[in-house]
A protein has these predicted regions:
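Preference for bulky hydrophobic residues occupying beta-strand positions
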Residues: 75, 91, 235-237
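Second-shell loop/turn segments in exported
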Residues: 24, 90-98, 123
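Structured beta-strand-rich core segments of catalytic domains in phosphoester-bond hydrolases
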Residues: 1-87, 189-193
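Active-site metal-binding loops of divalent metal-dependent hydrolases
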Residues: 91-93, 126-128, 231
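Divalent metal-dependent phosphoesterase catalytic cores across multiple superfamilies
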Residues: 1-13, 100-118
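Structural detector of well-ordered beta-strand residues that form the stable sheet scaffold
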Residues: 13, 39, 89, 123, ...
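Short, solvent-exposed loop/turn segments at secondary-structure junctions
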Residues: 22, 42-44, 53, 80, ...
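Metal-dependent phosphoester-hydrolase catalytic domains
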Residues: 99, 103, 113-122, 130-241
Length: 241
């Protein structure tokens, strides 16, 4: 869709139905399928593909006790400034099946070891459906090949966790959306962006007059909403030569 296009970038991943795109890898059965929203700058891609988070990785299916088929998309790139190669993985682990999350984590770490050379940088992102206190999280950070960018960032802005259930009033310390990177990647900044937008209510047309503020200030009551049930997570990182 033109609204989702970014100049100089293209979409990566498996496309099962034209016109449907999910920002997080998601598959609701075979009738409502997906295309991943991995972005790349044109001219940098070396290769790309995907595998299913399952015992059978090469075709759509549900793995272990998962409620839905789940997938991981990857891209292999050449950084034009450093001339170093790097890999980008994006996944969505199951929200119901505990075993599926456990085995998916092991599978992804094994795939990274299998596919990526030791000196190539790795970035792994997505909705993991496990927070930083869950034992499955340690599968990634204890692997020796991945670090949590939240922990290694030079500067951090995280006024909330990453899941909001479409309710901007909720507060949590849980981060279930992660950006893992190779330990050698320098993370300058990490942020959870908690911006909201406003929608009208029945009372929006009435100006609020009472309060300790200048009379020229015009205030109206609107409902705060989040564009997603997850907050965006952003990092600024550097590949060291």
């Amino acid at each position: 869709h033109p609204a989702l296009e970014h100049p100089g970038h293209a979409l990566l991943g498996a496309s099962f139905r034209a016109g449907f795109l999910a920002h997080v890898p998601r598959l609701h059965g075979h009738r409502h399928c997906q295309r991943h929203a991995g972005l790349r700058r044109s001219g940098r891609r070396l290769d790309d593909g995907h595998f299913w988070l399952s015992e059978i990785t090469d075709r759509p299916n549900k793995g272990w006790d998962a409620a839905l088929p789940r997938i991981c998309t990857w891209g292999h790139f050449l950084d034009l400034q450093t001339k170093r190669r790097f890999w980008f993985f994006n996944l969505h682990m199951d929200h119901i099946g505990v075993q599926a999350r456990e085995e998916s984590a092991k599978l992804v770490v094994a795939k990274i070891r299998e596919m990526c050379k030791p000196k190539e940088f790795v970035i792994l992102t997505g909705d993991f459906n496990v927070d930083q206190n869950n034992h499955i999280y340690t599968t990634f950070v204890s692997s020796g090949i991945l670090a949590d960018s939240y922990e290694t960032a030079g500067r951090r802005y995280a006024p909330n966790g990453t899941f909001n259930s479409f309710n901007p009033s909720l507060k949590t310390d849980s981060r279930i959306d992660h950006i893992f990177v190779s330990p050698s990647v320098r993370v300058h900044d990490y942020g959870v962006l908690t911006d909201t937008y406003r929608t009208e209510t029945a009372a929006s047309g009435e100006e609020i007059k009472s309060g300790a503020f200048p009379k020229e200030v015009s205030l109206h009551s609107y409902d705060a909403r989040t564009p997603s049930d997850h907050f965006p997570v952003v990092v600024r990182l550097e590949f060291r030569r």
